[in-house]
Regions:
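Short, conserved charged micro-motifs
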Residues: 706-712
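Conserved pre-motif C helix in the palm subdomain of viral-like polymerases
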Residues: 208-214, 433, 662-682
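Gly/Thr-rich phosphate-binding beta-strand-loop-beta motif of the actin/hexokinase/Hsp70
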Residues: 2-37
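Active-site-proximal helix-loop-helix substrate-binding element of RNase H-like nuclease domains
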Residues: 29-31, 36, 40-64, 68-217, ...
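Conserved "right-hand" nucleotidyltransferase catalytic core of DNA-directed polymerases
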Residues: 1-9, 14, 114, 129-134, ...
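A short acidic-Thr-Gly-centered motif at the start of a beta-strand
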Residues: 1-2, 63-67, 410-426, 682-687
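A common structural junction motif
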Residues: 716-724
Length: 741
């Protein structure tokens, strides 16, 4: 069967940052161009300015036939193309959209294969002969923004400036209404071109995108996903198409309160400082004049100053700093994000990205960021029904919130998950029970830990009791320690809730109690190295997880195969030899009225490049060219390797990423958890359920006649053929909103 490749270029008054579905649903959104190609044929283009030209008619016919015949249709970012087809295609061109099952996504193939999920970066990464046209982004900025071109051009003829601005506001797209002469010129990318030249370049850019996308897909064809992973991609399309239902009327009310509170805080800040809160440089200078000890106003510095040097600020300085902190409360920004992303029917679509996490394949979230919604405190959680009733009745205001509950931003952020609801209906809210703590011992074959679950023990409570902390802390400590986290990994997320001494104690206690897990860290690291040294063969880390190193096209890579048969891909892997060294020095401890004592203080383990012998390590220290100088003597050293691969670093940046045994075990554990969740969601769909929300080990579904919570849980817990004896269990509830922690 042939495959068609397609790329849309569109225009809209809606901001694309509101998500593809919200953008496409806007009545102003129209298709400007689309390029389509069958297999290896040259792309043909439909264009809005010449819809009846032979080429446009051919492109339209090809698209109609592909849809009618059920032929696979490939695009780089199917989330966008599917949304445009859902809302715009029939409205503008009279064509019913393709079935979701027809879509194939090259961006998903990039994510699954370890390549960058950007067409330009993927083409560069794969060293293709065809590259994305770099001027394209600038051309999109001109032709897709319905006001941009008018901004770039001077008023035409004797039209007055005020009339030109009116034309800009009311015209759907000036170039399409023949309101701008084709021979006018504008500045772009350091040069000038006429509107006609720009439009022709835009059409060429659209053609080229199809060519480059097709080449990326061809290059990655040897890494095509398995049928199960493809089924997961199609499930993800259906789930995103269903959308997450949100209470838009209540969101609007809270958004109004947030804006009012922001205005109030900004007014107070101006009264104290004479500045707007957004004037960061001026605000820093003002605060320094009132005792602020930091050198910037970034979140980390401000938090450090408030913790250590707050008393150095005078009264006005403290008030101003507190207001800036309140205004920067990030969690409350989910409310406007949910408003912006909501489609006209009150559903947020396209918020989940399948295979968004490179090292696990887990879903990630964009827009409202559902995966990190603020967890309400116990006190607030009990009050949520009351607060929500006041909100629905229109009786909530910032003054009342402050008096009854505290900081309005804190309260509104705590409400964010409760806006996920279907008016007049209930939803299923289900998550797997202690799933990571179950998967890890199952992967490494540790029956001792698995027996605890079979006996119904709460492993997080066991850790909490051993350390004298609550269950939440026990869970955090357990999850961090089991993946080779050191005391800092425990201390940082828990902050003031745990001391450094207790964090060290927790790590030592976990490692002593779980030698099988500690051994597995080394086994996973060693298996990576064995695979690198012996390419083309599979090397077992455990009975459930194995590694292989492939040097074949499209790039060298380590594959970590999970129980489901799915591979986590690590491009351009390496294992660099290093020496781990520990140092000590004597510290004199003086206590008033007592004889001074000498205490030995040890460093944490530090790394040195290369495999060094004791004499080389000592020589390195003696050179005095490193941070190691303050230490007096070496107390231990051993040789190991530092593992690295090429991957996602942060935001849109890609580069060298370091990994290690515990991190690999974490990827295997969380990746297997995702496979369980995906398998369960697909099974739930087969039983007639409609999952619309997934986060890590949690899923939400609609309640409807003929469906039950028990059946939804049973479907999610269906044991797959690739792990039939796994002790999978889940907890769930039925409520009017998303509530589960």
């Amino acid at each position: 069967m042939p495959t068609f490749s397609i790329d849309f270029e569109t225009t809209s008054a809606c901001d694309i940052s509101y998500g593809a579905y919200r953008y496409a649903a806007d009545p102003s959104t129209r298709i400007l161009l689309f390029a389509i190609a069958k297999d290896d044929e040259a792309p043909v283009v439909w264009r809005i300015d010449e819809p009846d030209s032979p080429e446009s008619c051919k492109a339209l016919y090809m698209f109609r036939m592909a849809i009618k015949d059920g032929t696979p249709i490939r695009a780089f970012n199917v989330g966008f193309e599917a949304a445009i087809c859902k809302y715009v295609l029939e409205r503008q061109l009279g064509i019913k959209p393709p079935a979701l099952e027809q879509w194939r996504c090259t961006q998903f193939l990039c994510r699954r294969s370890g390549a960058p999920p950007s067409l330009a970066k993927a083409a560069e990464f794969l060293k293709l002969g065809d590259q994305k046209n770099p001027i394209g982004k600038a051309l999109i900025g001109v032709f897709s923004d319905q006001n941009k071109l008018v901004d770039l051009l001077p008023p035409k003829g004797d039209i007055k400036d005020k009339d030109w601005k009116k034309l800009k506001r009311t015209s759907a797209s000036p170039i399409l209404e023949d309101e701008i002469p084709w021979d006018w010129s504008f500045s772009i990318a350091g040069g000038r071109m006429t509107v006609r030249e720009g439009w022709d370049a835009f059409i060429s850019y659209c053609r080229q995108d199809v060519v480059v996308e097709r080449e990326v897909a061809r290059k990655l064809a040897k890494m095509e996903p398995s049928p199960d992973v493809l089924a997961g991609f199609l499930f993800d399309l259906r789930m995103n198409d269903r959308g997450v239902p949100v209470d838009v009327p209540s969101l609007k009310k809270v958004q109004h309160l947030i804006v009012r509170y922001e205005e109030e805080l900004s007014g107070r800040f101006r009264e104290i400082t004479g500045l707007n809160p957004s004037q960061t440089a001026a605000a820093l200078k003002w605060l320094k004049g009132h005792g602020y000890a930091g050198d910037s106003l970034n979140a980390a510095t401000v938090a450090d100053v408030r913790k250590k040097d707050y008393d150095k600020l005078d009264a006005e300085g403290r008030k101003a700093l507190d207001i800036r902190v309140a205004l920067s409360f990030a969690a409350v920004k989910k409310v406007p994000a949910m408003m912006q992303w909501a489609c006209p029917d009150g559903r947020i679509r396209g918020a989940f990205t399948f295979y968004g996490a490179q090292k696990t394949g887990r879903w990630t979230s964009q827009g409202p960021q559902f995966q990190n919604m603020k967890k309400p405190g116990k006190k607030i959680k009990k009050l949520v029904p009351y607060i929500y009733s006041l909100l629905a009745a229109g009786e909530l205001d910032n003054e009342l919130v402050t008096i009854l509950f505290g900081n309005p931003y804190e309260i509104y952020a705590s409400l964010s998950r409760y806006f996920v609801r279907i008016p007049g209906q209930q939803i299923y809210d289900v998550d797997f029970a202690q799933v990571e703590a179950r998967i890890l011992p199952a992967l490494i074959g540790c029956e001792r830990i698995l027996d605890k679950f079979r006996r119904g023990e709460d492993i997080y409570m066991d850790v909490a009791n051993a350390l004298g902390v609550d269950r939440d802390m026990g869970k955090v400590i357990s999850l961090l320690c089991q993946f080779q986290g050191g005391w800092r990994a425990v201390k940082v997320p828990l902050g003031d809730r745990i001391t450094e001494a207790d964090a060290r104690k927790a790590v030592s206690a976990y490692r002593k109690e779980n030698p099988e897990v500690v051994e597995a860290w080394g086994v996973f690291q060693d298996t990576w190295i064995r695979a690198l040294r012996d390419p083309g063969r599979w090397h077992n880390a455990t009975e459930k997880v194995k590694f292989a190193y492939s040097t074949k096209d499209p790039f060298p890579r380590i594959l970590m195969r999970l129980p489901a048969g799915r591979d986590i891909v690590y491009p351009y892997p390496k294992a660099r030899p290093i020496t781990m060294v520990r140092y000590a020095r004597n510290v004199v401890v003086e206590v008033p009225g007592e004889q001074p004592t000498v205490r030995e203080e040890k460093s944490d383990w530090e790394r040195l490049a290369g495999h060094l012998d004791p004499q080389q390590v000592a020589a390195y220290v003696d050179l005095g060219d490193s941070f190691l100088c303050p230490w007096e003597r070496i107390t231990g050293h051993f040789h190991t390797h530092e593992l690295e691969f090429w991957g996602h670093v942060k935001d849109a940046h890609w580069g060298t990423v370091k990994t290690y045994g515990g991190d690999l075990l974490q990827s295997a554990t969380q990746g297997t958890g995702m496979d369980f969740l995906l398998h369960g969601c697909v099974e739930a769909e087969k039983r007639g359920h409609e999952p619309f929300f997934v986060v890590h080990d949690q899923a939400l579904g609609h309640h409807a006649e003929g469906r039950t919570l028990e059946d939804f849980i049973e479907a999610l817990c269906t044991r797959p053929a690739w792990f039939p004896d796994f002790p999978l269990d889940a907890d769930g509830s039925m409520a009017d909103s998303y509530q589960k922690d």
